[in-house]
């Protein structure tokens, strides 16, 4: 149990630092759409899709790696709470179209990236 807790802790810290770096780099590029948050969510969705596909095929993987990557890293990297706050800020500023676009791109983009990663991994390992 302690190993699993440490894996979540290490993965979460690493994912959070990655999210912060992406936000610092990409959020200033567009004043209405926080591109760093979007990038973090899309990358996280892709990684978790790839992880779930990999773990479903490689059943001998230590559970520590599973929680480090999915619960830890992807949990720290993806930013639903930040995303939600940013949408609320856009709404408060009266930028309803941008808020709706932000919701649309983050949610559908994340679903698409998860499905793409799962499909790519499954296709590459099919015999």
From Swiss-Prot:
GO BP: cellular detoxification of fluoride
Gene Ontology cellular-component terms listed: plasma membrane
Keywords: Cell inner membrane, Cell membrane, Ion channel, Ion transport, Membrane, Metal-binding, Sodium, Transmembrane, Transmembrane helix, Transport
Catalyzed reactions per annotation: fluoride(in) = fluoride(out)
Domain of life the protein comes from: Bacteria
Protein task: Fluoride-specific ion channel. Important for reducing fluoride concentration in the cell, thus reducing its toxicity.
Full protein name: Fluoride-specific ion channel FluC
Gene that this polypeptide is encoded by: fluC
